[in-house]
Amino acid sequence: MTKIRIKNFGPIKQGCPDDDGWIDIKKVSVFIGNQGSGKSCVAKLISTFTWIEKALVRGDYAISDFSAVKFRKTYCGYHRIANYFFNNAHSDAAEIEYEGEAYSMKYQKGDFQISEKQSRKYFLPQIMYVPAERNFISIIKEAKSFKSLPDSLLEYITEFNNAKDEIKDGLSLPINDAEIKYDKQHDVINVTGSDYQVELSEASSGFQSLVPLYLVSYYLANAVRRQVENPQKMSHNESQRFNDAVKSIWADTTLTDEQRRIALSAVSSQFNKTAFINIVEEPEQNLFPVSQRNMLYSLLEFNNYSAENKLVIT
């Protein structure tokens, strides 16, 4: 089973008091606690490590590409937790370990080690981190113009845009007997009920939080399920073109690390995903208790599409 152990990272000091500090990442993992207690830290680290493991398995990167500095500044910086490694004395005291299905990783006080497991059964996942700031999506169309937005939110906006393009006749929501329809001509999502229609940007805060979460989760869960049910193997020529594209990306010295990551992810999307790891911050955000329950039931339904899917929520 995949698991993680964390000490001296941001608000997390001694870590989990049980099982020698290890936290199992089960099919459904729920992190509950007071505000500022480190719930999101755990979720963001799980997201980071699962992405690195996926990139290594897929061949996007080699182990040697992940130095301690790059892990801290680039990959943890993606989730804006790069400064969580340092205590009040500006000393790096963080201790983080991750045991995945294919790789083990350990960060300890400035040193980062990765080792490959000999015996493994790995299911290539579609990983989605759902930030708490997702309600901004309802009112922002050109996210790229907002340079201060978190990278995780920018990536979520990309998936949101992909998902809304897949809405055909409408998509029923799990609350209020409502549904959403996408007006492609005006690039507007409308929330409709039995006797009303309103643009998402003008809808209640509950709809503005729920629609991005539900739509992207629905879209990705079904996309992965289709790939599992109808796997497509690359032909010899397609495989050769893929290898050539990867080599070309690595040879391009003008690319930044982030640009290279995006390019490799785009090329590697040809691989069939066989699992969906949905990491959700605050699924209950701005929702009435009955609506919270219905949203949770939907997330659990998507998670049950495959035995290999995982749901992590804070």
Write out the residue ranges for each language-model feature.
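Switch/communication elements of ASCE P-loop NTPase nucleotide-binding domains
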Residues: 1-54, 195-314
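P-loop NTPase switch/coupling surface
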Residues: 1-185, 192-193, 266-270, 304-309
